């Protein structure tokens, strides 16, 4: 990290002296700045930062979602189910080897999945009933239920790690990694930087890989730069050629500058407002009060104030990039800002002037979002206080609806059914759903969408409409993701990952 600061300091001085875009060295290396570099290379990790763009570069998985949101085989050759998604037979490709020369077989796939179940770091592995080897290249996976997206999630979270290499590591791959990936991690400084180089002994022909992960760059250097202005300086001075998910306020400064290419994509989560379902909360059983709050929110003003105009409305509670989202919802009435309507609903509700509480994290944009919401609600005659808490408090209390009346959160997932299950399943926790609500009518609609035959447009619409009409949650806005690169690197044949963002390793360049 000290080395990086020294480089950035020199870059700042150079920028001050010359006041122009400095040329980046053409060394064949793609240098990328991102807000987080892993603190460990272990393949066993929780969901935090799971969607970081470098994970598909350092570890291959059994399957991968492409930009069309279709699951492609990767280490797996094929799979099939004969019982409607409860049990799968998965066949692996032949000849898979890790960078230490160890063969990756069904024994390793079974071991990795069993170890993931035991460590319980990702909830999806708790949905596995059993996993067993069939032969050297085949294993059987039995699920507790055939919920849509479960098998797909397991395939993308099960990595090409051999048991022999993992057990030979003194720190469980904390500081070095052996995997089946075409890239080897040749330099790693935890939470600072990571260098990846193409292996000469990779086990298969690169062109046979899924296009979204087939490498076109021989060497990639990831640098952690958390501070937005420093990320911008690194881009301008050629310390890096690309910055991914740079904060909007900094990223928009490069609009209209031909020296930089800007790509804006829909955020993969967005921000949501969840209403408490606990009986102690005034909002729990007061539909008109919840609807009044929704009508009091000026989404366009919120996007302008918080995302400088670089964002989009949410027409479901959750992000439009999730599988199952229907663009037709964008033509529906969904609590378009109407202050007079909000005031009318407040008068018709059971609200008696109580002070309602908003719980949010004290980090990032959350406190500002809460302040904007507070101002909107006060205009409608609703008193609000904000509890911007430490993350430890959020983790301990986010599911307890007695601790708040409203909770600001940002929920991800590959399928809409994922996000819906996380938040609205009345049987998910001992106290009910993610806000202590026990809405079993909604639960029955949810469960209809969980099975392969039930995941239909009609059933998905039923859940969407129920959430909209009941207003137990409300989609606030979805800020764009900014990815910016120096135009001189000559991006050609751009490849995208599932969320629509550039896949830097799989994209071709003429100017590195």
Where are these regions (language model features)?
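Short, well-ordered beta-strand elements
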Residues: 27-36, 77, 87-91, 109, ...
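Detector for C-terminal structural segments
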Residues: 189, 193, 296-325, 365-374, ...
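N-terminal lobe/hinge region of extracytoplasmic solute-binding protein
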Residues: 33-81, 114, 178
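Alpha-helical secondary-structure segments
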Residues: 105-111, 138-140, 181-182, 214-219, ...
């Amino acid at each position: 990290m000290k080395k990086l600061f020294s480089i950035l300091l020199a870059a700042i001085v150079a920028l001050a002296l010359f006041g122009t875009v400095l040329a980046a060295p053409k060394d064949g290396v793609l240098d990328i700045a991102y807000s987080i570099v892993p603190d460990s290379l272990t393949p066993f990790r929780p969901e935090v930062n799971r969607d970081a763009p470098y994970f598909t570069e350092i570890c291959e998985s059994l399957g991968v979602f492409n930009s069309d949101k279709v699951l492609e085989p990767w280490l797996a050759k094929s799979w099939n189910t004969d019982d409607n998604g409860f049990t799968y037979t998965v066949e692996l490709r032949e000849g898979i080897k890790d960078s230490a020369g160890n063969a990756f077989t069904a024994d390793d796939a079974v071991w990795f999945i069993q170890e993931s179940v035991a460590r319980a770091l990702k909830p999806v592995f708790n949905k596995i009933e059993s996993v067993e080897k069939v032969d050297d290249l085949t294993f059987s996976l039995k699920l507790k239920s055939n919920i849509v997206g479960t098998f797909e999630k397991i395939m993308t979270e099960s990595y090409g790690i051999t048991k022999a290499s993992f057990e030979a590591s003194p720190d469980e791959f904390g500081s070095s990694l052996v995997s089946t990936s075409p890239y080897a991690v040749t330099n790693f400084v935890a939470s600072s930087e990571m260098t990846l180089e193409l292996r000469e002994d990779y086990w298969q022909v690169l062109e046979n890989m899924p296009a979204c992960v087939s490498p076109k760059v021989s060497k990639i250097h990831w640098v952690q730069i958390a501070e937005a202005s420093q990320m911008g300086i690194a881009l301008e001075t050629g310390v890096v050629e690309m910055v991914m998910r740079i904060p909007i306020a900094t990223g928009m400064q490069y609009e209209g500058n031909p020296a930089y290419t800007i790509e804006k994509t829909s955020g993969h989560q967005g921000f949501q407002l969840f209403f408490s379902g606990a009986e102690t909360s005034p909002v729990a059983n007061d539909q008109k009060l919840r609807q009044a709050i929704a009508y009091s929110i000026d989404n366009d003003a919120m996007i302008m104030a918080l995302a400088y105009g670089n964002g989009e409305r949410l027409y479901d509670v959750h992000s439009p990039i999730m599988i199952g989202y229907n663009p037709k919802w964008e033509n529906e009435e969904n609590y378009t800002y109407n202050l007079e309507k909000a005031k009318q609903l407040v008068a018709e509700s059971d609200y008696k002037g109580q002070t309602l509480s908003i719980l949010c994290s004290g980090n990032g944009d959350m406190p500002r979002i809460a302040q904007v919401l507070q101002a909107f609600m006060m205009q409608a005659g609703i008193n609000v206080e904000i509890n911007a808490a430490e993350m430890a408090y959020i983790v301990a209390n986010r599911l307890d609806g007695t601790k708040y009346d409203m909770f600001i959160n940002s929920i991800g997932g590959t399928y809409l059914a994922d996000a819906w299950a996380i938040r609205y399943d009345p049987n998910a926790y001992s106290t009910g759903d993610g806000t202590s609500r026990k809405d079993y009518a909604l639960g029955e609609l949810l469960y209809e969408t969980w099975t392969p035959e039930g995941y239909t447009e009609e059933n998905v619409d039923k859940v969407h409409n129920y959430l909209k009409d009941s207003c137990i949650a409300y989609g606030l806005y979805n800020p764009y993701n900014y990815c910016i690169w120096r135009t001189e690197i000559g991006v050609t044949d751009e490849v995208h990952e599932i969320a629509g963002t550039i896949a830097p390793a799989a994209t071709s360049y003429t100017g590195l």
